[in-house]
Amino acid sequence: MSEASGRTAGNEMPAKKQKLSSDENSNPELSGDENDDTVSIESGTNTERPDTPTNAANAPGRKGWGKGKWKSKKCKYSFKCVNSLKEDHNQPLFGVQFNWHSKEGDPLVFATVGSNRVTLYECHPQGEIRLLQSYVDADADENFYTCAWTYDSNTSHPLLAVAGSRGIIRIINPITMQCIKHYVGHGNAINELKFHPRDPNLLLSVSKDHALRLWNIQTDTLVAIFGGVEGHRDEVLSADYDLLGEKIMSCGMDHSLKLWRINSLRMKTAIRESYEYNPNKTNRPFVSQKIHFPDFSTRDIHRNYVDCVRWLGDLILSKSCENAIVCWKPGKMEDDIDKIKASESNVTILGRFDYSQCDIWYMRFSMDFWQKMLALGNQVGKLYVWDLEVEDPHKAKCTTLTYPKCASAIRQTSFSRDSSILVAVCDDATIWRWDRLR
């Protein structure tokens, strides 16, 4: 992978030499020609991810949703669209992530991925978005789907992991502007990357090859493979660690959600041994654990591809192509999730967040750092933001964000760590910045 930026010394994240000026880049009222908001980056050619093969309108009927819908009411959060940009490859942008590992006072930096491009931007006051760096994969057929931030535990440098259609994970150091590592192992495209919430070296990847993999990027070892006998039977589309990093919930095209514990003695030992492994001191390769059996599995939540899942405390938020994010938990309401058995067949659905015009797959929601807000875009450029800070989930309030020129499918959203900025990326290669007013 080559970078479009020149090499710069120093500990601060270097910027691209051809920086966009504030006149080209900052557009607080979004007036004038859209071309004024275009970021000039080398172009590439790639195809979109296909639409969902089954129409949600024709999906089979389902039983009741437990305690009812989470109706939309006026939300206490308000946002204003202050800027937009367009990357000139004109291919869908599938992923966006703010770097939440920055310190207070540091610039607000986010990364976007799409086509064979990885691009870093910095948010400035008054709505400005400044282009910092752009990386282009040598293979024009690469199509990046996902990215995740971490940091080097020795130098504290920010690191960005990216992956996509070729199934290769690349680790980029924005300080040195180099792709410092890459990992090959998955037999097909990688749909999502996630770093452990308490260990910056543990990277989780989920793939079209039906499996999840856990990597230690400090020692370059593959700790474990989750899949096989009772694993996913089709593409794994999303996964998430719980806040303590003890459990993983995964979901995929087989309509299922699966729980994998990584705080078992077997997994704790494997992680410890991955840190102790030194290829210079042994001729033996590291032995990866193969986890064939999840600790819980269900297909009772969704009737279509499950393309996004996130933990909310001990509860699960997941969505399919059915115009609703479902809040649920394994077992019965009173059950302790840490004591749920693999044979458990019960699930408790607590409610759902409803929205409209979002029945294509690979549309991912996000939460802010403190899990007080939930954001999702639909296929016509509309953003939904829910206030999660309510005692009764049925009273979760929603605000809908629209802007006339934003009319393409919003693939992913990301909040800045301080929740002051919400960024959305779209199928038409556009990036939209919304600033919080209160």
Curated annotation (Swiss-Prot):
Biased composition (Polar residues): 40-57
Keywords: Chromatin regulator, Nucleus, Repeat, Repressor, Transcription, Transcription regulation, WD repeat
Main location: nucleus
Gene Ontology CC terms: ESC/E(Z) complex
Gene Ontology BP, a term: chromatin organization
Subcellular location: Nucleus
Domain of life from the UniProt record: Eukaryota
Residue stretches of each WD repeat: 88-131, 139-182, 185-225, 231-270, 301-338, 356-396, 405-438
Keyword Electron transport in annotation: no
Annotated SUPFAM superfamilies: WD40 repeat-like (SSF50978)
SMART domains: WD40 (SM00320)
Electron transport as UniProt keyword: no
Region annotation Disordered: where it falls in the sequence: 1-70
InterPro entries reported in the protein's UniProt record: PcG_WD-repeat, WD40/YVTN_repeat-like_dom_sf, WD40_repeat_CS, WD40_repeat_dom_sf, WD40_rpt
Pfam families assigned: WD40
PANTHER family: POLYCOMB PROTEIN
Membership in a protein family: Belongs to the WD repeat ESC family.
Biological function: Polycomb group (PcG) protein. Component of the prc2/eed-ezh2 complex, which methylates 'Lys-9' and 'Lys-27' of histone H3, leading to transcriptional repression of the affected target gene.
Quaternary structure annotation from Swiss-Prot or TrEMBL: Component of the prc2/eed-ezh2 complex. May interact with ezh2, hdac1, taf9 and yy1.
The name this protein goes by in its record: Polycomb protein eed
Native organism: Xenopus tropicalis
Lineage: Eukaryota, Metazoa, Chordata, Craniata, Vertebrata
